[in-house]
Amino acid sequence: YEMPQMLKDAGYYTFGIGKMHWYPQRVKHGFDGTLLDESGRRQDPHFTSDYRQWFQVQAPGKNPDATGIWWNDHGAGVYKLDEKLHTTYWTGEMACNLISHYDPESRPLFLKVSFARPHSPYDPPQRFLDMYDNADVPDPAIGDWCGRYAKQLNPEEAASDAPYGNFGNEYVRNSKRHYYAN
């Protein structure tokens, strides 16, 4: 018995927007409705998220993954398209739109808004990355247990989604800056 269903049973209108991380991805888990963005995460070849459907209408022929950074990559890059096409913008806009058009007199609203970022890919619009130009981003913390994982990985040679390795402090700081800006 999931919380959205409990609230729905108590008279709420329940809605989820953004990353839900479900499978199958169109199961509502008690929500009256959802608008999904799984940021490229596809477990069902027949599933296309609401964000990607919207993106195809807004930017025909363009690629929402234009940075080339994928789900679970720890590399970083600047979002290459208009920031109004970014998944973070879409999620916020969908939530604001629902709230502004919702009649609170009808029944109480439970709205779950789940932004896919700062999860990878680390692809913020440039203006947000600029906020961290002079930020003091600390070197990665390395514990005593790291010895068994200490194999030196060169970022150009390593898979961008490798679970561990020494990618070098500058690589990690750059990824963190993009994470913060996301």
Language-model segments: residues:
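Formylglycine-dependent sulfatase
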Residues: Y1-N182
